UniProtKB/Swiss-Prot annotation:
Family assignment from sequence similarity: Belongs to the conotoxin A superfamily.
GO cellular component terms, A-Z: extracellular region; host cell postsynaptic membrane
Species name: Conus pulicarius
Broad class of where this protein is predominantly found: secreted
Region of interest called Lacks the Ser-Xaa-Pro motif that is crucial for potent interaction with nAChR, as start-end residue ranges on this chain: 51-53
Role noted for this protein: Alpha-conotoxins act on postsynaptic membranes, they bind to the nicotinic acetylcholine receptors (nAChR) and thus inhibit them. Has possibly a distinct nAChR binding mode from other alpha-conotoxins, due to a different three residue motif (lacks the Ser-Xaa-Pro motif).
Sites of Pyrrolidone carboxylic acid modification: 47
Tissue: Expressed by the venom duct.
Name listed for the protein in its UniProt record: Alpha-conotoxin-like Pu1.1
Length: 67
């Protein structure tokens, strides 16, 4: 294997380990700070999207209200 291939495999292993670790941590602890921060960011983005007519037209199902 070449150096580039080994580096790619290394990155894939690190990514897979991180995903498994994050999801198992989230299921074991409902108060995960990173997950709660992500929820807050998603909520803020959704609220801002609902105020923009073009974004609202594309994602009406996320806004939950009629315009």
């Amino acid at each position: 294997m070449g150096m580039r291939m080994m580096f790619t495999v290394f990155l894939l292993v690190v990514l897979a380990t991180t995903v498994v670790s994050f999801t198992s941590d989230r299921t074991s602890d409902g108060r995960n700070a990173a997950f709660n921060a992500f929820d807050l960011i998603a909520l803020t983005a959704r609220q801002n999207c609902c105020n923009v007519p073009g974004c609202w037209a594309k994602y009406k199902h996320l806004c939950g209200r009629k315009r």
